[in-house]
Each structure stands twice: as structure tokens, then as C-alpha cells.
Amino acid sequence: MRPISPQALATLLSNAGVTPESASEAMNSGGHVGSGAKQRVDPKLSRTGRGAMSPAELRVAIDKAADAAGIPNDKMVRAKWHALYRFLIEHESGNQPDRIQEVKDVNMSGAQAADGAPANAARGLCMMVPGTFGGHHVAGTSDNIYDPVANIAASMSYVMTKYHVEPNAGSNFDTFEARRHANGYTGY
């Protein structure tokens, strides 16, 4: 390997659109925007009062959640996570952040909570139950289970932990995604 002069390196990086600041940020962040660190919370149950989110609103929310959850900001990686979460959210909640579980199952239990639903009912875009949301809450996001970014980020954290899916969409990502598409849609 031949040494390169500092000026030549600076020119090379500049032509690639890399600044010393962005290179330093990437090196210090491991290539992600957020750390994806979990922060246990007692979820708030405050509905947003909004209807279904538009595709553009979902794209922004998924990107912010991916940033917080430590998903690398790589076009191919983000495209895979976006496709997965657009599909998952459409089937889980119909793109409605205030959705409460309608299917009677083991989660549909507990005393009536502040939002009128049983305490353990699944809520939000990704249909997170409060205990799972609280245990997989991503630091830096809202502690409100109905907040779109917080709900998606907690879901991503849960998927990465429970199903051993790597943030870079490597190990187990394709298997997890294929299982969601089985029979039209299979929940997680």
C-alpha cells in the first residue's frame, strides 16, 4: 500500500462528498444516526387524534425511527427496512397511529386503561402491547405508545432482539420478512 499525501486524501474525500465532520460523525456513530439503545419506560397512552398517515408521512416516520433504532443510513439497507415496515404497518394498523387491537386474543386483557382499551391491548402503527413497547422503547423517542416514531422504533428494537435481525438487514432479515408475507400476512 502506498502512502497518500494529506492534500491528495482531502481532494479524494471532497470529490466523494465527504467532509472531515461527516467522516468523524460516521466513525463515531458506527455508521448509524442513533444508538438504538433501549430505555425502559412506563408507556403513556395518549392518542394522537389523527387519522391514517399518508405514504409521505409514513416514510418520514420510518426514517426517524430507523435513525433512532440504529439502522445504518445506507440506501439499500433503508429500502429493505422501509419495504418491511410499510407492509407491516399497513397490515397491523392500516397506517393509523391511534389504532387499538380489535382481535380478541391473549393480549386483549386487563382493566380498562386511560385510552379506553384493555390494559394489555396492542396499540399504534405496529400494534405494540404496552409491556413490549416499554421494554423495547428506544432512547430519545417519545414514551407515548401512539407516537408513530416511538412505536416504529420500539417495534424495530423488538424485531432485532426477538428475531435476531441485524440492523444492516443482514442475518435473519430476509427470513423475518418472508414470514410476514406468508399467507398474505403473518403477524409478529
Label the model's feature ranges.
Residues A61-K64, M76-Q112, V149-M160, T175:
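Short, functionally critical alpha-helical segments immediately adjacent to catalytic or ligand/cofactor-binding
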Residues M1-L12, G187-Y188:
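Short, compositionally biased, intrinsically disordered N-terminal export/targeting signals
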Residues G31-Q96:
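Export/targeting segments at the very N-terminus of extracytoplasmic proteins
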Residues R123-Y188:
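Catalytic and binding regions of secreted/periplasmic enzymes and modules that target cell-wall glycans
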Residues S5-L9, T19-A23, P55-L58, W81, ...:
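Short amphipathic alpha-helical segments that mediate assembly, nucleic-acid/protein binding
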Residues L12, A16-V33, A37, I152:
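Composition-driven recognition of long, low-complexity, acid-poor segments enriched in small hydrophobic
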Residues R50-L58, N73-K80, A117-L125, G140-N151:
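Extracytoplasmic/periplasmic, Sec-exported soluble proteins
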Residues D98, E102-V138:
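Substrate-binding/active-site groove segments that recognize
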